[in-house]
Amino acid sequence: ARKMRNYVKAVRAVEVDGVKAATPAPIVLAGHGPKLMQVAADLADGLFLYLQPTAQVAAARKLLGPHKQIHAVVRTVRATDAATARRVARAALGFYLQLPAYHRAWAAAGFTPADYADGGSDRLIDTVAPWGSPAQLKAVIQSYFDAGASHVSLYPIHPDDDYQPGKAGGLLWDWPTLEALAPAA
């Protein structure tokens, strides 16, 4: 966190040659641990959260106050069958279930080491990769706004993607889910 604190201060101090923007570009830090969240509260314009439950969003909002940005990236599975949805989510989240930094963040939301074992507990999977019909997923999205997110980005998990152990992401976008959840024009 000390390095990030120094980095943000250095970025803020940069003098740009040439035309200056009317408003400086915001600095939004990615981090879900307490130290980086504190740096975001102290020095940044916002915080970027990934795979975090609404409880973490609410905690971040309390820490950052009402005016800073909170971007929540939510992995979703458009499926109404629990077994199918969880199988798809587990394939996509396998990489993150191994990372101690995520374990610590999820522990702050009430999860235990048993929740990270064997592909993740149903409770953890359902929380960090919500699944359901488009109507159910819209309610989940709203719950992130209600918890304090200023922006919610959907990252739907494609059921046919070939997630590889040890790799962070898949290559296929689930366009039908994005279209089903898009606001009406």
Where are the model-predicted features located?
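Active-site-adjacent structural elements that line small-molecule/cofactor binding pockets in enzymes
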Residues: 1-185
